[in-house]
């Protein structure tokens, strides 16, 4: 109840762009939110950064985490659904803009390479299996 939803401005607009989506997402309209454009540094210290990666949806994002022991981790969101998708650069079936998705894939891979980041695909069971189980967590 006291949380603030951090949402990309284009994503929020997309969520309410049709009568059907307005109805489906009506509860979100009541939530306290911070809308942003571009990348968003959550705490202003570079440790948690929401990365703009449009294509899957207009305001799709990935997440960059800098952990004291684990290093830099990138969570793909829906940019990739499986390791095979990443390796072959397959665009997900549900996608609003294939060209933007492909540009986001190039950008994501550039960031991952430049930072030497560990990439976690949240829809990939093998990636999820390697994460600590609650109440444990990455350090």
Describe each model-derived feature in a short phrase.
Residues 62-139:
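Cap/insert and terminal regions of metallo-dependent hydrolase folds
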